[in-house]
């Protein structure tokens, strides 16, 4: 017969072994993860970044663990040492079964174990504070101060977050110490809450008073820190310290600092008095003041004094919010210029602005991606994940183009072919890009292709010498290169072409130890068991470019749209990265994450073949990136170190521009009274897109790239622009442009229209398009014939001092997936036309500006007929898209018109 004691012993040993095995597995997984991370960071040239982050986390972990465990152990040990020994372990005091448990507890070991366990948990919880610690120790000044406390903005970015993190940890540590001491005293019988006599033993009262004093001292410091948090409050009209905060909240916080400090002193004095009324009175005083003075009194003051005089009292604080919000988002750099809207556009002006006309985008992102997919994906496992917009200097001149990388998606490989070898050794990379001009189309309504097929062929586009993409917007899994299995490169007829990776990326996994390491880390035993892995084999990790950049630089925020670039015969990805913060005083939060400061401080370039990642500082004046340069020396290079060709492709990022435009809707108003009354609030225009079914929902217009010549500028350039309309109105009031070409990269310009002139907004143009009988009848006819009409995005095109509107129209078979560009709608002034091509639409739009023959005799009459003939031929050339012929006819027309004008003047004399 087995003894229950022996069974209990065996069960205890089994439980110990199970726990030990679990802990060992967790430890092994953690260690292997660290080793793999170290190897990967070293392979991409950023071992220093890994070392800095790891050592900071290790030091932070050890410091927090040592202090936390030490403080917890000290609190528990003092409680154990001071507890009333006479009452210890007596079930009649504690009751059953608590008394029996207390009698068996190995107190010293238990207290040490709890201290170590809780200390470990607290240390793990503080690991994420490594960036706060590094920024604190490497901070730089902003050179600007806040208007209330006159502290440098850098204090709020780098010091205040560290103080708040320290406060939160200390409060948690103090709370855990109090709980541990309370449990010890309770189990030892020093706290009687049920049995008589109720109360605390002298030792428990002394210990509790000491801890309560520490709490009040921390609370005093917390109130001191809360003064600075007033700069982020939203109790007034806008974010930031309001009149009530400054004149009521701030004095109250100083009073609460004093009350909490007095309560701390009283609590420590009570260690001698041991009178529960002292800490009770102190707690009541602190809590009561927080409720009455910190909550009720400011609310009453705001309601009955500030609210009736809000504009007068809040004006200085409104000005603080306006000025600092504009500073935080870079809006102070916006140059405001008038746009007179003369609306005197004609064919000659179009010819003078050919770079703009030649680059009006007729292809929307989604229809073009659908067309690329049908024409150029070649095989089911290729995928165009995104369509990008850029500009290139090509044979036809400075052109805006759209392009998409042909990436390999393993999930699209047929299910019966998704073997481990195929997924990780055979299908390793995508191939090439497709590129097309934004304005051109074929006779069938399909895009003209500058780059197409596999391997990529160039028809007027740049030449690609290395088209393979091992790194891209897909690339979710790992691949192994240089194995005994040749890598699939591209299909050729009925056969396939194979290749071998010759790039620099990858971690060697030829040895058995490394194969075991990666098999464990990735949870894939095939890495260890496969016979296709050789001594030269290498594993490529983090092939998704956003994941790759985020792994190296987790402290940067990334733009949603990395874009592919063809440069010097190779493929690169450019990823815009931001430094952000939520600690800019008085600044209005403008992102979903609550950030109220943003700079596009870094441009990241990733080689699509080699996987190399280079960080370039595009805003070296940003204090946050200066701090990171001090933390990670050598990581960031100046933008001038980027190759000249790649520099031609940097562009103003969409996410940043969108955030700035949203803030600028209200914060273009710099006068406090105008801002308070929202007299000139702007909004993004509405427009119609998608299927034309008669009830197409309206959506807000988003920023778009285009090539145009800004007013008073000598040449066309690549800009990101967005029109603006007044709030709850549809007429256009301004347009905002961000310049992308050197040397004006990053400059923002707001062009404002005269308020006395009506300028049609996009939604008003959309309404006029829908009201046009010919256009609506044609769309209805197409829809009835089994086709689906897709309305493209309307583009506002500023030319000279006029506004032109252009919108593409696509047709797609009801059961098909191939959109075709069938019509172009153009509007100018009061006219709306729809034609087969952009040239034909412009010719029809400006047909009324044909020169009228002056009724004269002889040579003048002949010149008039000749001028009209040249004009008619110019219109025909424009319809055909023959811009050189169009220009030649206009050049021939000019002297005839001048002669006619001179003759008419002579007759008037």
Swiss-Prot record:
HAMAP family: UPF0182. The chain crosses the membrane at residues 16-36, 58-78, 114-134, 169-189, 205-225, 246-266, 281-301. One of its GO terms (cellular component) is extracellular region. Its main location: membrane. InterPro entries: UPF0182. Belongs to the UPF0182 family. Keywords: Cell membrane, Membrane, Transmembrane, Transmembrane helix. The keyword Manganese does not apply. It comes from the Bacteria. It holds the Pfam family UPF0182. It comes from Cupriavidus necator (strain ATCC 17699 / DSM 428 / KCTC 22496 / NCIMB 10442 / H16 / Stanier 337). This is UPF0182 protein H16_A1615. It is a multi-pass membrane protein.
């Amino acid at each position: 017969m087995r003894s229950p004691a022996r069974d209990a012993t065996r069960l205890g040993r089994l439980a110990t072994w199970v726990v030990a095995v679990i802990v060992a597995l967790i430890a092994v997984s953690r260690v292997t993860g660290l080793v793999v991370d170290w190897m990967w960071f070293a392979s991409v040239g950023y071992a220093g970044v890994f070392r800095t982050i790891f050592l900071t986390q290790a030091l932070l972990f050890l410091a927090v663990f040592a202090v936390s465990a030490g403080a917890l152990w000290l609190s528990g040990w003092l409680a154990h040492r001071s507890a009333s020994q006479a009452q210890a372990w007596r079930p009649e005091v504690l009751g059953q079964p608590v008394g029996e448990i207390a009698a068996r507890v190995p107190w010293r070991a238990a207290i040490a174990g709890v201290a170590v366990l809780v200390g470990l948990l607290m240390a793990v919880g503080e690991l994420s504070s490594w960036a706060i610690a590094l920024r604190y120790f490497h901070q730089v000044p902003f050179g600007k101060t806040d208007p209330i406390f006159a502290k440098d903005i850098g204090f709020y970015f780098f010091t205040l977050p560290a103080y708040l993190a320290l406060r939160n940890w200390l409060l948690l540590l103090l709370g855990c110490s109090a709980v541990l001491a309370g449990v010890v005293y309770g189990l030892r019988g020093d706290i009687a809450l049920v049995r008589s006599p109720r109360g605390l033993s002298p030792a428990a009262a002394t210990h509790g008073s000491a801890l309560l004093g520490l709490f009040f001292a921390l609370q005093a410091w917390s109130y001191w820190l809360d003064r600075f948090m007033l700069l982020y409050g939203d109790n007034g009209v806008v974010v930031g310290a309001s009149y009530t905060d400054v004149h009521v909240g701030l004095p109250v916080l100083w009073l609460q600092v004093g009350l909490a400090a007095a309560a701390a002193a009283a609590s420590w004095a009570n260690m001698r008095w041991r009178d529960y009324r002292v800490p009770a009175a102190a707690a009541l005083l602190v809590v009561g003041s927080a409720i009455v003075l910190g909550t009720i009194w400011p609310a009453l003051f705001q309601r009955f004094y500030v609210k009736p005089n809000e504009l007068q009292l809040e004006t200085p604080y409104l000005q603080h919010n306006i000025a600092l919000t504009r500073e935080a988002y870079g809006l102070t750099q916006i140059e405001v210029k008038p746009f007179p809207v003369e609306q005197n556009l004609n064919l000659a002006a179009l010819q003078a602005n050919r770079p703009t006309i030649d680059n009006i985008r007729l292809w929307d992102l989604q229809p073009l991606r659908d067309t690329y997919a049908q024409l150029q994906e070649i095989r089911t496992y290729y995928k165009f994940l995104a369509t990008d917009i850029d500009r290139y200097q090509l044979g036809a001149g400075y052109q805006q183009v759209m392009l998409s990388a042909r990436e390999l998606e393993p999930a699209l490989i047929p299910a019966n072919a998704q073997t481990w070898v195929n997924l990780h050794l055979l299908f390793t990379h995508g191939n090439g890009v497709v590129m097309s001009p934004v304005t051109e189309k074929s006779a069938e309504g399909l895009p003209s292709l500058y780059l197409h097929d596999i391997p990529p062929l160039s028809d007027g586009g740049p030449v690609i010498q290395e088209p393979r993409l091992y790194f891209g917007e897909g690339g979710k899994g790992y691949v192994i290169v240089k194995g005994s299995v040749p890598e699939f490169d591209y299909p050729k007829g009925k056969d396939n072409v194979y290749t071998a990776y010759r790039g620099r990326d990858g971690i060697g996994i030829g040895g058995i130890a490394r194969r075991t390491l990666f098999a464990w880390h990735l949870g894939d035993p095939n890495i260890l068991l496969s016979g296709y892995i050789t001594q030269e084999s290498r594993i490529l990790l983090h092939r998704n470019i956003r994941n790759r950049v985020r792994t190296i630089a987790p402290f940067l925020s990334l733009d949603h749209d990395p874009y592919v670039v063809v440069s010097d015969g190779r493929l690169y990805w450019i990823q815009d990265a931001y430094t952000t913060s939520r600690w800019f005083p008085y600044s209005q939060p403008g992102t979903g994450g609550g950030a109220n400061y943003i700079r596009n401080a870094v441009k990241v370039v990733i080689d699509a073949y080699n996987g190399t990642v280079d960080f370039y500082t595009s805003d070296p004046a940003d204090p946050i990136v200066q701090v990171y340069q001090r933390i990670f020396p050598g990581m960031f290079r100046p933008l001038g170190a980027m190759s000249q060709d790649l520099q031609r492709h940097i562009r103003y990022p969409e996410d940043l521009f969108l955030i700035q435009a949203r803030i600028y809707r209200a914060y273009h108003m710099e006068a406090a009274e105008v801002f308070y009354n929202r007299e000139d609030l702007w909004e993004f225009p509405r427009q119609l897109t998608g299927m034309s079914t008669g009830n197409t929902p309206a959506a807000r217009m988003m920023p778009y790239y285009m090539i145009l010549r800004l007013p008073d500028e000598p040449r066309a350039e690549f800009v990101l622009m967005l029109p603006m309309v007044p709030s709850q109105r549809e007429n256009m009031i301004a347009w905002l442009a961000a310049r992308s070409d050197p040397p004006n990269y990053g400059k923002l310009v707001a062009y404002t229209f005269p308020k006395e002139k009506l300028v049609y907004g996009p939604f008003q143009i959309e309404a006029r398009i829908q009201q046009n009988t010919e256009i609506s009848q044609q769309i209805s006819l197409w829809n009835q014939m089994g086709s689906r009409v897709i309305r493209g995005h309307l583009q506002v095109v500023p030319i000279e001092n006029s506004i032109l509107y252009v919108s593409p129209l696509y047709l797609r078979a009801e059961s098909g997936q191939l959109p075709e560009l069938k019509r172009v709608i153009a509007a100018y002034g009061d006219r709306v036309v729809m034609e087969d091509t952009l040239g034909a639409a412009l010719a029809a739009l400006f047909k009324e500006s044909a020169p009228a023959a002056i009724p004269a005799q002889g040579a003048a009459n002949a010149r008039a007929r000749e001028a009209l003939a040249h004009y008619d031929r110019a219109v025909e050339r424009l319809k055909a898209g023959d811009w050189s012929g169009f220009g030649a006819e206009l050049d021939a027309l000019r002297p005839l018109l001048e002669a006619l004008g001179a003759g008419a003047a002579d007759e008037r004399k």
